[in-house]
């Protein structure tokens, strides 16, 4: 699973997910991309599940680019713990994804293969997604 090697601070505020993606909103490396249509926190294990299902679908060919990285720690207090006594321990890591953000890209595969791989990967994610080509990414937003 993905997580940062080290961070400046161990814990973060939750923050807000307003507006569209500020960067990473176009297909930069591959031929096809999977973009988010709504805001969400994407966990590192969800990213890994998408990577596995896409690589299994492609078998030998194709290159997968993961364009998001889980750099935000999410904390959780133990069960049946009274309030107070500080913020809980880091439970998992998430990537803050806003609408229009390209999450995955693929290269070296046909359009049908990419479409099916992104459909399978989309089922692993908690948000609506859409496939875009390298040339016509503007029309999807």
Swiss-Prot record:
<dbReference type="InterPro" id="IPR047873">
    <property type="entry name" value="Ribosomal_uL16"/>
</dbReference>
<dbReference type="InterPro" id="IPR000114">
    <property type="entry name" value="Ribosomal_uL16_bact-type"/>
</dbReference>
<dbReference type="GO" id="GO:0000049">
    <property type="term" value="F:tRNA binding"/>
</dbReference>
<keyword id="KW-0699">rRNA-binding</keyword>
<keyword id="KW-0694">RNA-binding</keyword>
<keyword id="KW-0689">Ribosomal protein</keyword>
<dbReference type="GO" id="GO:0006412">
    <property type="term" value="P:translation"/>
</dbReference>
<dbReference type="InterPro" id="IPR020798">
    <property type="entry name" value="Ribosomal_uL16_CS"/>
</dbReference>
<comment type="function">
    <text>Binds the 5S and 23S rRNAs and is also seen to make contacts with the A and P site tRNAs. Interacts with A site tRNA mimics, and is probably one of the key factors, along with a helix of the 23S rRNA, in positioning tRNA stems in the peptidyl-transferase center.</text>
</comment>
<dbReference type="Pfam" id="PF00252">
    <property type="entry name" value="Ribosomal_L16"/>
</dbReference>
<dbReference type="InterPro" id="IPR016180">
    <property type="entry name" value="Ribosomal_uL16_dom"/>
</dbReference>
<dbReference type="GO" id="GO:0022625">
    <property type="term" value="C:cytosolic large ribosomal subunit"/>
</dbReference>
<comment type="subunit">
    <text>Part of the 50S ribosomal subunit. Contacts the CTC protein (RL25).</text>
</comment>
<comment type="similarity">
    <text>Belongs to the universal ribosomal protein uL16 family.</text>
</comment>
<dbReference type="GO" id="GO:0019843">
    <property type="term" value="F:rRNA binding"/>
</dbReference>
<dbReference type="InterPro" id="IPR036920">
    <property type="entry name" value="Ribosomal_uL16_sf"/>
</dbReference>
<protein>
    <recommendedName>
        <fullName>Large ribosomal subunit protein uL16</fullName>
    </recommendedName>
</protein>
<keyword id="KW-0820">tRNA-binding</keyword>
<dbReference type="GO" id="GO:0003735">
    <property type="term" value="F:structural constituent of ribosome"/>
</dbReference>
<keyword id="KW-0687">Ribonucleoprotein</keyword>
């Amino acid at each position: 699973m993905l997580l940062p090697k080290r961070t400046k601070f161990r814990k973060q505020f939750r923050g807000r997910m307003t507006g569209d993606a500020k960067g990473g909103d176009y297909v930069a490396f591959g031929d096809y991309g999977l973009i988010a249509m709504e805001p969400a926190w994407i966990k590192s294990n969800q990213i890994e599940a998408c990577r596995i299902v896409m690589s299994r679908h492609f078998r030998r060919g194709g290159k997968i680019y993961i364009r998001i990285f889980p750099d935000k720690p999410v904390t959780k207090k133990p069960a049946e713990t009274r309030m107070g006594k500080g913020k809980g321990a880091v439970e998992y890591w998430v990537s803050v994804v806003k609408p229009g953000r390209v999450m995955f890209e693929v290269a070296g595969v046909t359009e049908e293969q990419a479409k099916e791989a992104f459909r399978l990967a989309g089922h692993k994610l908690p948000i609506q997604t859409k496939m875009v080509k390298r040339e016509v990414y503007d029309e999807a937003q």
